[in-house]
Amino acid sequence: MQKRLLVLAAGILQVPVIKKAKEMGIYVIAADGDKNAVGLQYADKAIVVNITSEEDMLREAREEKIDGVIHPCSEVSMNVMGRLNEELGLSGITREQAIRATNKHLMREAFEKGNAPSPKSILTKSAEDAWEQFMTFECDGILKPSRNSGSRGIAKVIKTNPNFTNTSKEEFSKLYDIALNESRDKSVLLEQFIEGPEFSIEIIVWDGQVNVLTVTDKKTNEAPHFVELGHNQPSCYSAEEVEKLKAAAVAGVKALGVNNCACHAEAKLQNGKAYLMEIGARLGGDFISTELTHLSTGVDMVAAAINATVKQVDETAEAEMGKLTGGLNIPGL
């Protein structure tokens, strides 16, 4: 029987997923709140609906009798996806796991409990509270929204760098307000700034096995906001450094407890140690997961994520998942 996949969001970043699922013989229902979303035209069925509404999407999913749901390259409806998986008994992350994977404070707590390396992090109460906490730091800091994706609202605050003027209290408060306005739950984290190169780690979790596909070197602009400008695969860093990044990412994924999904981890290296910035339980954006990873590794990450979602077991799926275990997995962590 033909599998039925619900794709939450149908923008330009979701088009490769919609097209790939159709190539795999899956019936695709694409949902987006924008009737002009470019991906809707490629689906077998297009639904214009508020994809952030759990009740609306639960109703649509039941009517469509879906076998799986995927929310690629975006986080706005992760809670919805988790709720659908729970209510309909589907493969993938739960609602609780979705919340943990989209709330940076809860994520940091999970990392700490799971011994996954990450920076010192404080959930602040106000700009004044954040400033007082910052005054106790012996390093520079980062202000970031507790709930948001990408680099929106993130800013470096300077305290100890001799090459720059320290951030004034007035400027600190302005940056805090920007982070607060960008946070979907109106809370802001103050974190230790990790000085060093930035990376992402592309992962597929399949039946409890955490499979690392590759490590991506990232190029960003300078402080204070760190917008991504480019990506390189495979990593140009040493094998030892790459293994440290992989190990940190695997520990982080296991700390979050997610299963049968793609993961996009972000990390930095400082003084030879890997630090996790965050992990998204989804395909990464900027065409890293949907295009670049396939080109550099030969592994179709989109197909693998879809297979994990709908649990499609056929010759194509087995071949793709077989590639994942070809020396890319890091067991025992």
Outline where the language-model segments fall.
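ATP-binding N-terminal substructure of ATP-dependent carboxylate-amine bond-forming enzymes
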Residues: M1-Q97, T102, E128, I306
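C-terminal active-site "lid" helix and adjoining low-complexity regulatory extension at the edge
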Residues: I18, G39, G230, E240, ...
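A conserved helix-loop-beta module that forms one wall/lid of the active-site cleft
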Residues: E86-I158
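Glycine-rich phosphate-binding loop of ATP-grasp-fold ATP-dependent ligases
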Residues: P119-S121, D140-I178, S187-V188, E195-E202, ...
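Phosphate-binding core of ATP-grasp and ATP-grasp-like enzymes
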Residues: I178-S187, Q192-S235, E243-H264, K268-L276, ...
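Short amphipathic alpha-helical signal-transduction/dimerization elements
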Residues: V253, A303-V310, D314
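Long amphipathic alpha-helical segments used for membrane anchoring, targeting, substrate engagement
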Residues: V310-L333
